[in-house]
Curated annotation (Swiss-Prot):
PANTHER family per the UniProt record, alphabetical: 12S RRNA N4-METHYLCYTIDINE METHYLTRANSFERASE (PTHR11265:SF0), S-ADENOSYL-METHYLTRANSFERASE MRAW (PTHR11265)
Residues that bind S-adenosyl-L-methionine: S35, G36, H37, D55, F84, D105, Q112
Organismal lineage: Bacteria, Bacillati, Bacillota, Bacilli, Lactobacillales
Signal sequence coordinates: none
Record's catalysed reaction(s): cytidine(1402) in 16S rRNA + S-adenosyl-L-methionine = N(4)-methylcytidine(1402) in 16S rRNA + S-adenosyl-L-homocysteine + H(+)
Gene Ontology annotations of biological process type: rRNA base methylation
Name of this protein: Ribosomal RNA small subunit methyltransferase H
Pfam families: Methyltransf_5
Stored InterPro entries: RsmH, SAM-dep_MeTrfase_MraW_recog, SAM-dependent_MTases_sf
Alphabetical keyword list: Cytoplasm, Methyltransferase, rRNA processing, S-adenosyl-L-methionine, Transferase
Annotated compartments: Cytoplasm
Family: Belongs to the methyltransferase superfamily. RsmH family.
Length: 316
């Protein structure tokens, strides 16, 4: 399993160290993935500390159960197989009403990208799937073959920010009228054919943004992140911290907006003083996002777009 689930953790020390770990604290890894952040966080906990790990991918949990066995044996880890949008409800089931810190590593993990049959990558021929939870109902196949023209344009533009969204949606509509589009390479070729020649000369794969858009739609990634981060802020104890790693502008803008909203006083301008109940709930630990070091960028190409934002709870 270890070899099958190889994952290089991004911003490992930065994301965990910025949580200011208390040895006896209660922490959450909202995106277990390859368990790199969890392993490092657990190494900083004392015997009374506990970590709750969320992932909707059973393979990630199976891998972590091998990697984190010493901590499991000591009763310091609880795995929860669910979408992190249900974070608060699932933690309440375990009697957890307050946490000292939480970490998010948003986006797709390397094993999911690299596992051909998951259909996340435009670089490998595979069935159109893209589900992070293999038990979920909606697949990329259904999005590509059943969404109408306007809905395709909407998700391509909104989640992929691709200026050729209409042309690509039209190509898909024409192709699927003849036969269903069933593989990643079929879809990638259609996307490429919809773009002008000068666009194809630009750096990066022409299908990258559209694949991202479909993946976000299939997994409702932004909706889940929005709901989860808001619940996480509610759960944080005073002085508790939240670390969020993002990999594209949509995730980063969402995180920045949620942090700004919670770190701004909810009071009209001009008041002589701000009542306690209207004071900000969060304080930004770093005003600008923390970026990977040059050393990390050289060692891990997937770290290039990573950004880390951190905030601290200052009011319940």
């Amino acid at each position: 399993m270890t070899n099958e689930f190889h994952h290089v953790t991004v911003l490992l020390h930065e994301a965990v160290d910025m949580l200011d770990i208390k040895p006896d604290g209660i922490y959450v890894d909202a995106t277990l993935g390859g368990s790199g952040h969890s392993a490092y966080l657990l190494s900083l906990l004392g015997d009374k500390g506990h970590l709750y790990c969320f992932d909707q991918d059973q393979k990630a949990i199976d891998h972590a159960q091998e990697q984190l066995k010493p901590y499991i044996d000591k009763g310091q880890v609880t795995f929860i197989k669910d979408n992190f949008r249900h974070l608060k409800a699932r933690l309440l089931e375990h009697g957890v009403t307050e946490i000292d810190g939480i970490l998010y590593d948003l986006g797709v993990s390397s094993p999911q990208l690299d596992e051909r049959e998951r259909g996340f990558s435009y670089k490998q021929d595979a069935p159109l799937d893209m589900r992070m939870d293999s038990q979920a109902a909606l697949t990329a196949y259904e999005v590509v073959n059943t969404y109408d023209f306007n809905d395709l344009v909407r998700i391509f533009f909104k989640y992929g920010e691709d200026k050729f969204s209409k042309q690509i949606a039209r190509k898909i509509e024409q192709a699927r009228a003849i036969k269903p589009i069933s593989t990643t390479t079929e879809l990638a070729a259609l996307i490429k054919s919809a773009k002008p020649a000068k666009e194809l000369k630009k750096k990066g794969h022409p299908a990258k943004q559209i694949f991202q858009a479909i993946r976000i739609e299939v997994n409702d990634e932004l909706g889940a992140a929005d709901a989860s981060i808001q619940r996480a802020i509610e759960l944080l104890a005073l002085d508790g911290r939240i670390s969020v790693i993002t990999f594209h502008s949509l995730e980063d803008r969402l995180t920045k907006h949620l942090f700004k909203e919670a770190s701004t006083a909810d009071a009209p301008k001009g008041l002589p003083f701000i009542p306690d109940e209207l004071k900000p709930k969060l304080e930004l630990v770093s005003r600008k996002p923390i970026l990977p070091s040059q050393k990390e960028l050289m060692a891990n190409n997937r770290a290039h777009s990573a950004k880390l934002r951190v905030a601290r709870k200052v009011r319940k």
